[in-house]
Amino acid sequence: AEAMKCCHAGSSLELNAIMVNLLCKLDRPELAEKQSKMMQQIDDDSTIAQLACAWAHCASGGKKIQDASYIYQELGDKYKWTPKLYNGSAVCSMMMGSYDDAERDLLEAIALDPKDADTLANLAACASHLGKSSGRFINAMKQTGVAHDALTKISALEDDFERAAAHVDA
């Protein structure tokens, strides 16, 4: 709530982008879209406004995912592809069910930064959908030392499994 107050008080594109990100995390895609449109009215060509638009489109889902994918493609082609842009493109591909395309983007991202925790987490998810082992990506993520959300969830699931197994054995 405090972060939203701070973002709402400012009028910079950066603060607006943080607000879009917060709204996406709060599962309020309609408000994220509205905030993104406000940013585009300020400066439609700015990279940060385009990224915020892609985030809002991903959160909205449906046909807007393709629009988000186009934004990531345009930014990667216009500037330089980064692991974050590859990850954004891969997430769009996964949301559209194109796991082979997602894997291709993620392998490009991991070639640029082999220790990027987001890329490793997305590779693990993508591998699972492709019927491949995700263990090496999870292990690599653990070795980065980054406290990633995916690792927290995996740890909680492992704990739940251990508790359930203990009840079965008892």
PLM region spans:
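Solenoid-like repeat scaffolds
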Residues: 4-13, 36-45, 59, 70-81, ...
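Start-of-helix register in tetratricopeptide repeats
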Residues: 14, 31, 48-51, 84, ...
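Structural motif corresponding to the intra-repeat A-B loop/turn of tetratricopeptide repeats
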Residues: 26, 60-62, 96, 130-131
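Long, repeat-rich segments with strong aromatic
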Residues: 70, 78-102
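Terminal, low-structured helical/coil segments at or just beyond the last alpha-helical repeat
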Residues: 133-170
